[in-house]
């Protein structure tokens, strides 16, 4: 039976990572792959939705002349409109990526790539998010001018994806992160989220009118514990596969109840 796959991202409809994944998935599987992605770069926007402005869907041609749908909103908007207006049904899978830059640790809550995947899971689809490590920041923001090679990552994602076909999906979202030196033979490691991916840095500058403004930046964390996604990708140079859930309830719920319930 032909699968329905909704392919989204947060880097924009014309991302080469999106195109590489579409082509590899489309060639490998009996699937209808529908691309619905933001008109513009939406990195760092998390699972935000547009509530105070209308959204538009524009049919467009990708670099390989195939058809896609550009949405004037966030990655989560793309999933919502992709399901309710383009497909008019919940697909079998929502796949988000390939993101330019890794999405690791608890900072995944800021990721538009993960936001889209969680929205797909929220609608009842099986969801995967996939990201490629990029160690030079300027490559993240000048994709069209950079030598980033996505085909290997797309094939790795395909191989991971195949492991779940025919089985009951193991979690709400599977988060896949690929190191920048990976090959199709790079080991795959099942991991947990690290506490953090970056050490935050705020840079203050002064504009021509002597007013302060700020750039937010971060330095990559390397010293997370073994078994985490950060350690797997940055230290061991393995592909990281992390099972994620929509349920953000603290693991110590019973202990919390026992300690605090009588105080309310």
UniProtKB/Swiss-Prot annotation:
GO cellular component: cytoplasm
Subcellular location: Cytoplasm
Its EC number(s): 3.1.3.5
Keywords: Cytoplasm, Hydrolase, Metal-binding, Nucleotide-binding
InterPro entries membership: SurE (IPR030048), SurE-like_Pase/nucleotidase (IPR002828), SurE-like_sf (IPR036523)
Keyword RNA-binding in annotation: no
Keyword Hydrolase: yes
Cofactor detail note: Binds 1 divalent metal cation per subunit.
SS bond list: none
Highest taxon, organism lineage: Archaea
GO molecular function, one term: nucleotide binding
Catalytic activity, reaction form: a ribonucleoside 5'-phosphate + H2O = a ribonucleoside + phosphate
Cofactor needs: a divalent metal cation
Positions of a divalent metal cation binding: 10-11, 43, 99
NCBIfam families, sorted: PRK00346.2-1, surE
Physiological role: Nucleotidase that shows phosphatase activity on nucleoside 5'-monophosphates.
Family: Belongs to the SurE nucleotidase family.
Protein name (database record): 5'-nucleotidase SurE
Gene name tied to this protein: surE
């Amino acid at each position: 039976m032909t699968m329905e796959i909704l392919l989204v991202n947060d880097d924009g409809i014309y991302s080469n990572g999106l195109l590489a994944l579409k082509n590899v998935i489309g060639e490998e599987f009996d699937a209808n792959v529908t691309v619905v992605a933001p008109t513009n770069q939406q990195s760092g926007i998390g699972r935000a939705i547009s509530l105070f402005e209308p959204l538009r869907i524009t049919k467009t041609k990708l670099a390989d002349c195939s058809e896609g749908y550009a949405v004037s909103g966030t990655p989560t908007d793309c999933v919502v409109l992709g399901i309710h207006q383009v497909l008019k049904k919940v697909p079998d899978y929502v796949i988000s990526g390939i993101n330019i830059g890794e999405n690791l640790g608890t900072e995944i809550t800021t990721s538009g790539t993960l936001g889209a995947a969680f929205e797909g899971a929220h609608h009842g689809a099986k969801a995967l998010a996939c990201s490629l490590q990029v160690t030079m920041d300027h490559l993240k923001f000048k994709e069209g001018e950079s030598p980033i090679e996505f085909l290997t990552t797309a094939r790795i994602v395909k191989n991971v994806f195949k492991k779940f076909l025919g089985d009951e999906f193991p979690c709400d979202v599977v988060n896949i992160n690929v190191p920048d030196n990976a090959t199709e033979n790079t080991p795959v490691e099942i991991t947990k989220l690290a506490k953090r991916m970056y050490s935050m840095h705020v840079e203050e500058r002064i504009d021509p009118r002597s007013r302060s403004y700020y750039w937010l930046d971060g330095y990559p964390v390397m010293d997370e514990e073994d078994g985490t996604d950060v350690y797997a990708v940055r230290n061991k140079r393995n592909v990281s596969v992390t099972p994620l859930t929509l349920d953000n309830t603290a693991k110590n719920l019973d202990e919390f109840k026992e300690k605090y319930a009588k105080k309310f």
